[in-house]
């Protein structure tokens, strides 16, 4: 009986550690993306230029801030669902 209990406890500890680790990694990645977005103003400028537009700095900043607001809203909306 002691061997069975030890095996069950080892399996439960392993599963708990795996789930806890996945949770912590997910939170860390979300924080990293919130602090350092993958898209910057230079990428927006390149994107607008690739579409045949000659982007002004005001247009670049407008599009960049719009994208950042959408990302923050999506992140907040995702947190509400949980």
Swiss-Prot record:
Belongs to the UPF0154 family. It comes from the Bacteria. The chain crosses the membrane at residues 5-25. It is found in: Cell membrane. Keywords: Cell membrane, Membrane, Transmembrane, Transmembrane helix. InterPro entries: UPF0154. This is UPF0154 protein SPD_1662. Its main location: membrane. Pfam families: UPF0154 (PF03672). It comes from Streptococcus pneumoniae serotype 2 (strain D39 / NCTC 7466). It is a single-pass membrane protein. GO terms for cellular component: plasma membrane.
């Amino acid at each position: 009986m002691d061997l069975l209990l030890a095996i069950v406890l080892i399996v439960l500890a392993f599963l708990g550690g795996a789930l806890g680790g996945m949770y912590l990694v997910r939170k860390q990645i979300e924080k990293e993306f919130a602090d350092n977005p993958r898209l910057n103003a230079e990428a927006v400028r390149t994107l607008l230029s690739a579409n045949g537009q000659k982007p002004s700095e005001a247009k670049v900043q407008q599009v960049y801030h719009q994208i950042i607001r959408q990302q923050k809203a999506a992140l907040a909306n995702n947190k509400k669902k949980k």
